[in-house]
Amino acid sequence: MRVRKRKGAEEHLENNPHYVISNPEEAKGRWHEIFGNNNPIHIEVGSGKGAFITGMAEQNPDINYIGIDIQLSVLSYALDKVLDSGAKNIKLLLVDGSSLSNYFDTGEVDLMYLNFSDPWPKKKHEKRRLTYKTFLDTYKDILPEQGEIHFKTDNRGLFEYSLASFSQYGMTLKQVWLDLHASDYQQNIMTEYERKFSNKGQVIYRVEARF
């Protein structure tokens, strides 16, 4: 979903280089150096306005988080949340999720999150879905052996498609939630969309898949 253009968004990002990495190609292979530690690195592709990535960073200070989004205005709102939180273990990237191997070395990312990705419901747009096989090729490259993807959505069609895509790729479905909020899963951090959809009574689906 597109967000209305935010005045001053570009300047906002430029004025916060500690959090927003302006030349991510130069960071490839150097992420631990950039964070200043050897803690695990988790990324969220399509981080939206930052509720999830910020909440995770606050909950897990010994993990480094990178929020990735292609929309300038959206990322500027995520930066607001990061600044408000004061978390030191977050970086933000304004890049396309299809080109992750340009920014991360092989095995450099320990775990990745896909939350409420665009379902692209039309068959002709299948290749744009973030769980399509060519995206999985990229994810596998930047994750370690047996690296994991944690995926959440409210869209049943996309969820079923993604389960099939993961399985056909040879991935292991570690755990599947058909109604996350009705489960006893305690570690959930909600995204903005998740809270909105949940308040409307929509079921939230989740899966942890391992290469």
UniProtKB/Swiss-Prot annotation:
S-adenosyl-L-methionine binds at residues 44, 69, 96, 118. Pathway: tRNA modification; N(7)-methylguanine-tRNA biosynthesis. InterPro entries: SAM-dependent_MTases_sf, tRNA_(Gua-N-7)_MeTrfase_Trmb, tRNA_methyltr_TrmB_bact. Substrate binds at residues 122, 154, 191-194. Residues 124-129 are annotated as: Interaction with RNA. GO terms for molecular function: tRNA (guanine(46)-N7)-methyltransferase activity. The keyword S-adenosyl-L-methionine applies. It is an enzyme of class 2 (transferase). Coiled coil: none annotated. Catalyzes the formation of N(7)-methylguanine at position 46 (m7G46) in tRNA. PANTHER family: 3-DEOXY-D-MANNO-OCTULOSONIC-ACID TRANSFERASE/TRNA GUANINE-N 7 - -METHYLTRANSFERASE, PENTACOTRIPEPTIDE-REPEAT REGION OF PRORP DOMAIN-CONTAINING PROTEIN. Belongs to the class I-like SAM-binding methyltransferase superfamily. TrmB family. This is tRNA (guanine-N(7)-)-methyltransferase. It comes from Streptococcus agalactiae serotype V (strain ATCC BAA-611 / 2603 V/R).
